[in-house]
Amino acid sequence: IGGGPAGSTVARYAAEGGLSVLVVDGRDPVGTPLQCGELVPTNEEMKSLCPDVPEVDDLFRTPDEAISSKSDKMRIVKPNGKGMDFKFGGMVLDRVAHDEALVDLAASSGAKFLLGSKVKRVDDESVHLSDGTVLKGKVIVGAGGYNDPIRKKHWSEESLNIPVKFVLKEGQHS
């Protein structure tokens, strides 16, 4: 459920592994309207942030035409208005083009897409669509983001509210 970056990537890997894959997404086309998140780390930055993740270049495929710009630093502006710069290899994506490219990769690997179809609920191995259609699957992946029906069924709102606190401090730290 969900054909965004996570759903399309899971679909590609599952299809490449020989599984029969159907991605259901309420949007048509996938990626519209824009949801969020256009700044992402480059693959080189991901390798330094997550050194134990194998095959980063295969996992995160971003075609050149989906990259709006690149940067080598990030700036955080503190409440007092003073900025702090730090090294960070990043890319600003054209998210619609990026999502379309990931859908194309998954489809070229054999995944099928059912777009413009809303999931009403999921019961065990059954996915119930809002038009009354019932789909069966041995494995159902919830990649629909915050509004995903599997997320709603298994995780409460309170469990997702993770307080994040941090302190910005200038200087060299190791």
In which residue ranges do the predicted regions lie?
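Beta1/beta-strand and adjacent pyrophosphate-binding region of the FAD-binding site
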Residues: 1-6, 22
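Predominantly flavin-linked oxidoreductase catalytic cores and closely associated redox partners
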Residues: 3, 13, 17, 29, ...
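Short, hydrophobic alpha-helix immediately C-terminal to the catalytic nucleophile
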Residues: 8-12
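N-terminal FAD cofactor-binding segment of flavoenzymes
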Residues: 13, 26-74
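Short beta-strand "acidic-cap" motif of Rossmann-like dinucleotide-binding folds
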Residues: 19-25
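Short polybasic amphipathic segments
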Residues: 72-78, 125-128
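Short beta-strand to alpha-helix junction loop
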Residues: 84-105
